[in-house]
């Protein structure tokens, strides 16, 4: 009997100089710099949009000693080095943070000179650890300039949306500074004019687009980077999965990619940059590396599942040393949206530090200065939980606070809270005792805590946790409130509470690299032409969080270093890039 034989499908082939895995800020920076350096560059994105976790973020980058600082007469290099030495100590190789401090300003200047990726400096944005020498009051963080999404044309929908809870009217973005101004809309002509301008633009946008096209924060940064990639005809493969990295004789030289149902063998003549965003969205890796109780939710992009880390380990790449928690944290409240999806709302600066709120554990007791950074706040939750149940933590305030500042997904000046109570997101009662019972915390402990705290609020001095005593606390408080911008009484019923739990915004455990972002193997030797940046790279800060935008600053700086190093490397014989 004759058998008909069907030939196996042939694997397609492609060749590029530089291949970047991941379309967040770090990956797009690497791809853009590669293209600007004359490399044939490919960006591979596993989803159908660019932006990664960057699109959900503030878009701030922490770059000490940047040009905008120096133009104001501030030479910040020595102080920043002192600050990071005090913060990180011996947990990570000092040469890596020195490489960051040296290259960060160069990266910004490079992009400013060659692209329209642009930032403006925060003059008043204090570093998170004001207790350490070298901490700055501002100047190191920079925010991306707003971007007109209409300039992307049909590619506008390729930029990932921010989380819905950080937009107004279902699609209008505003900056933190604009949010502060808009809170005065009933008392200020400036606020009224700003609101009218923003809403008018948004309504016009909605005639043609599914959301507003005035992009700010991380969306602006992602869109600016993406537009510059498009302008330079950088190849971007969406919905593409990398199955395997290929290495020969200690050199990363290619990868197998599945795209549109076909397997493609891609040769990379100069380098491969891993920028997959770490593993905050991987249940398996969270179980393996995170502290208990395990974080169930994440505020990161769902595609950050550690694929690139596992692929690199298959060719000998080394992970960094385990840290205290191997994560970078937000305390987040969890809600169910109308469409049934889950909202993970990060409590960053809009409520925790404002006057009139305390954070308590199951004993009804405070355990932390509520105004510390989101990372330190969540770490304090875990530390307290070792002795008394602190996960979830309850943020407790009164109705007056919710009206003035909002609470989690509840915006300021929300007139009716019944829907939030009915959904279970908000707990509310006429007395602290009643609220404590609904929350499941000790009523006597909560009553004593609020009584003590109210005394602190009247005196303006938090004897217990010193809230409002440093510049970072005060910057996150209410400058118009006296005597302490972070302390106010909790005294007018009804009383309210929202639960927060640890959620990873990123991971600090990643691939070990050298100062050029080149990944090293388990013997400490560089794997030639294999690079990592962002959360795929082991934290240069040893899991610490120095200031606003520190992670994006690292990601973009080492993405820049990776591309520059790859561009200067020798070309393997036989590649197209080797031909005259």
What name fits each language-model region?
Residues 387-494, 562-565, 569, 579-580:
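Helix-rich C-terminal "cap"/substrate-channel and partner-interaction subdomain
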Residues 130, 138, 145-193, 309, ...:
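An anion/pyrophosphate-binding glycine-rich loop and adjacent beta-alpha core
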Residues 244, 251-252, 445-540, 544:
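A glycine-rich dinucleotide-binding beta-alpha-beta segment and adjacent secondary-structure elements
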Residues 212-219, 231, 259-338, 517, ...:
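Glycine-rich loop(s) and the adjacent beta-strand/alpha-helix scaffold that form part
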Residues 1-18, 36, 219, 223, ...:
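Extreme N-terminal leader/targeting segments of oxidoreductases
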Residues 18-43:
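N-terminal Rossmann-like FAD-binding beta1-loop-alpha1 element of flavoenzymes
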Residues 201-270, 309:
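Helical element adjacent to the flavin cofactor pocket in flavoenzyme catalytic cores
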Residues 46-235, 357-359, 366, 400-403, ...:
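Conserved N-terminal/central alpha/beta ligand/cofactor-binding core
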């Amino acid at each position: 009997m004759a058998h008909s034989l069907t030939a196996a499908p042939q694997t397609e082939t492609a060749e590029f100089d530089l291949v970047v895995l991941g379309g967040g800020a770090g990956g797009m920076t690497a791809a853009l710099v590669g293209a600007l350096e004359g490399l044939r560059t490919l960006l591979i994105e596993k989803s159908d949009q660019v932006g990664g976790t960057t699109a959900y973020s503030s878009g701030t980058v922490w770059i000490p000693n940047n040009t905008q600082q120096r133009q104001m007469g501030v030479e910040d290099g020595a102080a920043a080095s002192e600050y990071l030495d005090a913060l990180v100590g011996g947990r990570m190789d000092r040469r890596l943070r020195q490489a960051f401090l040296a290259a960060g300003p160069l990266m910004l200047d490079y992009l400013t000179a060659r692209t329209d990726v642009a930032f403006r400096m925060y003059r008043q944005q204090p570093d998170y650890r004001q207790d350490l020498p070298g901490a700055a009051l501002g100047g190191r963080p920079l925010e991306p300039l707003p971007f007109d999404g209409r300039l992307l044309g049909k590619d506008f929908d390729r930029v990932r949306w921010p989380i819905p809870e950080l937009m107004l009217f279902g699609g209008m973005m505003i900056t933190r500074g604009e949010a502060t101004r808009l809170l005065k809309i009933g008392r200020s002509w400036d606020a009224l004019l700003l609101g009218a301008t923003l809403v008018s633009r948004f309504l016009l946008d909605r005639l043609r687009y599914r959301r507003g096209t005035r992009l700010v924060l991380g969306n602006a940064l992602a869109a600016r980077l993406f537009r510059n990639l498009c302008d330079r005809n950088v190849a971007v493969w969406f919905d593409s999965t990398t199955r395997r990295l290929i290495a020969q004789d200690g050199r990363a030289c290619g990868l197998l990619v599945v795209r549109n149902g076909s397997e493609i063998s891609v040769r990379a003549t100069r380098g491969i940059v891993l920028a997959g965003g770490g593993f905050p969205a991987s249940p398996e890796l969270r179980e393996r590396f995170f502290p208990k109780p395990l974080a169930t939710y994440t505020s990161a992009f769902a595609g950050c599942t550690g694929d690139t880390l596992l692929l690199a380990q298959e060719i000998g790449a080394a992970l960094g040393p385990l840290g205290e928690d191997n994560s970078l944290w937000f305390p987040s409240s969890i809600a169910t949206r109308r469409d049934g999806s889950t909202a993970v709302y990060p409590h960053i600066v809009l409520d925790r530090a404002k006057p009139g709120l305390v954070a308590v554990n199951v004993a009804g007791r405070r355990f932390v200065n509520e105004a510390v950074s989101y990372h330190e706040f969540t770490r304090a939750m875990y530390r307290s939980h070792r002795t008394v149940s602190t996960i979830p933590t309850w943020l407790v305030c009164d109705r007056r606070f919710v009206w003035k500042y909002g609470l989690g997904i509840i915006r300021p000046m929300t007139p009716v809270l019944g829907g939030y109570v009915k959904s279970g997101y908000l707990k509310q009662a006429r007395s602290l005792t009643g609220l404590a019972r609904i929350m499941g915390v000790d009523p006597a402990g909560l009553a004593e805590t609020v009584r003590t705290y109210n005394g602190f609020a009247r005196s303006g001095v938090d004897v217990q946790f010193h809230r409002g005593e440093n510049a970072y606390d005060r910057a996150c408080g209410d400058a118009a409130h006296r005597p302490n911008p972070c302390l106010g009484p909790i005294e007018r019923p009804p009383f309210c509470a929202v639960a927060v739990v640890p959620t990873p915004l990123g991971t600090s455990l990643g691939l070990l690299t050298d100062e050029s972002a080149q990944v090293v193997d388990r013997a400490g030797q560089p794997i030639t032409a294999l690079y990592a940046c962002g959360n795929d790279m082991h934290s240069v800060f040893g899991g610490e969080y120095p200031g606003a935008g520190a992670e994006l600053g690292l990601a973009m700086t080492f993405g820049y270093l990776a591309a520059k190093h790859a561009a200067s490397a020798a070309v393997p014989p036989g590649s197209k890039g080797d031909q005259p």
